[in-house]
Amino acid sequence: MCIRDSYTHSLGTAAIVWHFTHDLKQSVAGLLHDIATPAFAHVVDFLNGDHMRQESTESRTRMMIASSPELMALLDKSGLTLDDVDDYHRYPIADNDSPRLSADRLEYTLGNAHLVFHCPKAELKRIFDDIFVGKNEENVDELCFAHADIADIFTQLSLRQSEWFVSDEDRFSMQALADLLREARQRNVLTVDDLYLDEPHVIALLLSDPVLAARWQDYRRITGTQSGAQKPEGTYAVKIAAKKRSIDPLVQTSDGLRRFTTVNADYASKLAAFRADDFDRWVWAKYE
């Protein structure tokens, strides 16, 4: 399977923002929005106790842009300032609050649909070509669908992704790795700044310590998870929730733009069921 990384995601987000706005500062803000993503990405949010919002690493965005002479020179050459591009949250086409649709959510949803769920590129193009910029309930720009049948295809892919993002396997693996990184910090094997290099660097540090190396190799042997109401004795287990990412896009109807859940009862029911999971169960590793 091809690997998606923050760089690819950022390029795609910027391209989508440019496609719908032709605004340079919005597009560059989209390009740079993940510049502060650390090694293992959202695992560090779990390490920071920010597993419900998953925004803890964004605080370094402005500093990382400002500390790059090359980026600052390019911004100046383009007539842009640091304030123009250091926070993509201010541009609703680039980013907005869930369950709205933005370039950020659109990019990773379509990317995962293709690389993880093997959705054909032609289908992704049908989805993308159906999207336009409209005004939402608060009269703010938002990406919308022109046709309900295309919105239906997109939302089924989106919901499948949402379930994957908070699956027992995902939550457990994120928390287990976060706990391993926490132990590495406690043993003075790595620092916070080490996390802002890359995964091979962090892994090399883990392998440099016999205790952590054994834990890392054990982590790599995990093939799945088991779950139950009771915590098994003598077994590492977690009971943890996570940020539920979901999309309920606007779709054009004869009555104007409406949220898809108001025009499609099946999706409304499935989305409600997804949101109802309280993660009230213990999860532990399964090995071959």
Question: Model-derived features: where do they sit?
Answer:
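Short alpha-helical catalytic segment bearing the HExxH-like zincin motif
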Residues: 26-34
